[in-house]
Amino acid sequence: MLYRDEGIVLRTYKLGEADRIIVFVTRGRGKVRAVAKGVRKTKSKFGSRLEPMSHVALQLFEGRGELDIVTQAESIDHFRVIRDDLDRIARASSMLEAVDQMAQEGEVSPRLFQMLLGGLRALADHNGPLVVPAFFWKLLALEGYRPILDACAECGSEGPLVAFDLDAGGLLCADDRRGTAVSPEVVDLLRRILGGQLGAALNEPASSATTDVEHLATRAMEHHLERRLKSVTLLDRA
């Protein structure tokens, strides 16, 4: 059966001498793995449209096993601005990897697709220090892990909140402090990201507070996934 959908390429890997398996997150079917036949040939009909990060309109044939077959792919956005910047490529790769690890085949999640699309667009528009950390926090919140930020996660005290602990699930007061010490600026940025002021947070210039938020976001994502994010190492080197 043929079907149409809209997807973003998360990753690809070789199959045989000329084909590739393409892993998409799609708007209508969630995570999909499909074979692109002949895509590695010089004169492939797909050209470069099925590279990681590509936003494409797809026609696929639904396979009987685990793999569908890509029959058509038309580019919607190739995110050229990101591809021309090594730092942006590294940041985008960490977003793709997080979604790839988070998404499950057969689980339809239009919000996950839209969140990744929005994250890539934000990264293309401006490469601020909080684009990827904000994406991680929003993705974790979508999956049900939303840190407690308005009061101590242990005793409920409203403050001052001076630490963040992953096992506690959020911020902690001075009496219950453990985990990572956080400044008032970090607390403010976390609240902005998850409290409806994302635009303002994304415009923040680089500072020690944005670096701390980035480290916390990476640790929280890896804690949730129970694995290291390989692309974060690349990001550290970019």
PLM regions and their residue ranges:
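Non-catalytic alpha-helical scaffolds and adjoining flexible linkers that form interface surfaces
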Residues: 1-238
